[in-house]
């Protein structure tokens, strides 16, 4: 039975390979790296991206302030394209830690006086180059030190001492438009704040400890 096929060698090997072969879907599932979860403290849009891989109809410019803000930036001149070059994704714990150390090593953020415009520029740059939706850089309320809500982000906002503010505003070379001269206009507590790196924030989620009410849905 089988004619010339009965003389073909190697079938037993092929049969074993066929038996062990996984279905294509299962093989693809095993090959795909598991996506990292969004970091604790990110906003609603990032939670959408984590759960659904996209922004759903529950978060639009009409219902979500971060979506509305981002949409408005498309018409602004910020020095680089607003739309991301890479797939949109939520900020993760590891990415927040890595970004913190990158900015610490490169310099430019440590000790910089905070303003909403400067924060917006940083958020848009991270969004454009890395695809992280800009609802991750939020802080606890004042007065005093403002801790990041997103676990892994190691920059906090620290009030500048009044003496240093007064010293910086002395003389004729100071600019009234500089954030140091704005006397905390962006801040509800009217405090002048500056970014400060704190490596302990990678291990100690101060915001969650101080304000557990912000994390009820996490």
UniProtKB/Swiss-Prot annotation:
Membrane topology: Lipid-anchor
Record's keyword terms, sorted: AIDS, Apoptosis, Early protein, Host cell membrane, Host Golgi apparatus, Host membrane, Host-virus interaction, Inhibition of host adaptive immune response by virus, Inhibition of host autophagy by virus, Inhibition of host MHC class I molecule presentation by virus, Inhibition of host MHC class II molecule presentation by virus, Lipoprotein, Membrane, Myristate, Phosphoprotein, Secreted, SH3-binding, Viral immunoevasion, Virion, Virulence
Protein function: Factor of infectivity and pathogenicity, required for optimal virus replication. Alters numerous pathways of T-lymphocyte function and down-regulates immunity surface molecules in order to evade host defense and increase viral infectivity. Alters the functionality of other immunity cells, like dendritic cells, monocytes/macrophages and NK cells.
Residue segments, region Binding to ATP6V1H: 160-192
Biased composition (Basic and acidic residues): 14-37
The protein's name: Protein Nef
Positions carrying Phosphoserine: 6
Family: Belongs to the lentivirus primate group Nef protein family.
Entry's localization field: Host cell membrane; Virion; Secreted; Host Golgi apparatus membrane
Motif mapping: PxxP: 84-87
Site (described: Might play a role in AP-1 recruitment to the Nef-MHC-I complex): 18
Motif (Dileucine internalization motif): 176-177
InterPro entries: HIV-1_Nef_anchor_sf, HIV-1_Nef_core_sf, HIV_Nef
Gene source species: Human immunodeficiency virus type 1 group M subtype B (isolate BRVA)
Renumbered residue ranges of the record's region Disordered: 1-44
Entry text on domains: The N-terminal domain is composed of the N-myristoyl glycine and of a cluster of positively charged amino acids. It is required for inner plasma membrane targeting of Nef and virion incorporation, and thereby for infectivity. This domain is also involved in binding to TP53. The SH3-binding domain constituted of PxxP motifs mediates binding to several Src family proteins thereby regulating their tyrosine kinase activity. The same motifs also mediates the association with MAPK3, PI3-kinase and TCR-zeta.
More details: HIV-1 lineages are divided in three main groups, M (for Major), O (for Outlier), and N (for New, or Non-M, Non-O). The vast majority of strains found worldwide belong to the group M. Group O seems to be endemic to and largely confined to Cameroon and neighboring countries in West Central Africa, where these viruses represent a small minority of HIV-1 strains. The group N is represented by a limited number of isolates from Cameroonian persons. The group M is further subdivided in 9 clades or subtypes (A to D, F to H, J and K).
GO cellular component annotations of the record: extracellular region; host cell Golgi membrane; host cell plasma membrane; membrane; virion component
Region called SH3-binding, residue ranges: 81-90
Extent of motif Diacidic: 186-187
Subunit organization: Monomer; cytosolic form. Homodimer; membrane bound form. Interacts with Nef associated p21-activated kinase (PAK2); this interaction activates PAK2. Associates with the Nef-MHC-I-AP1 complex; this complex is required for MHC-I internalization. Interacts (via C-terminus) with host PI3-kinase. Interacts with host PACS1; this interaction seems to be weak. Interacts with host PACS2. Interacts with host LCK and MAPK3; these interactions inhibit the kinase activity of the latter. Interacts with host ATP6V1H; this interaction may play a role in CD4 endocytosis.
């Amino acid at each position: 039975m089988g004619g010339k096929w009965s003389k073909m060698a190697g079938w037993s090997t092929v049969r074993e390979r066929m038996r062990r072969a996984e279905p294509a879907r299962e093989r693809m599932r095993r090959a795909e790296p598991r996506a990292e979860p969004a970091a604790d403290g990110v906003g609603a849009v990032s939670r959408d991206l984590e759960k659904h891989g996209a922004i759903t109809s529950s978060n639009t410019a009409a219902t979500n302030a971060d979506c509305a803000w981002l949409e408005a930036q498309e018409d602004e001149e910020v020095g680089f394209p607003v739309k991301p070059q890479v797939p949109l994704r939520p900020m993760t714990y590891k990415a927040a830690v890595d970004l913190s150390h990158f900015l610490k090593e490169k310099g430019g953020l440590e000790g910089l006086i905070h303003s909403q415009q400067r924060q917006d520029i940083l958020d848009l740059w991270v969004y454009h180059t890395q695809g992280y939706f800009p609802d991750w850089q939020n802080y606890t309320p004042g007065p005093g030190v403002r801790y990041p809500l997103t676990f892994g982000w190691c920059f906090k906002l620290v009030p500048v001492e009044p003496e240093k503010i007064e010293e910086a505003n002395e003389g004729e070379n100071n600019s009234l438009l500089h954030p140091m001269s704005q006397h905390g206009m962006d801040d509800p507590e009217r405090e002048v704040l500056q970014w400060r790196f704190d490596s302990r924030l990678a291990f100690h989620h101060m915001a969650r400890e101080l304000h557990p009410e912000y994390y009820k849905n996490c």
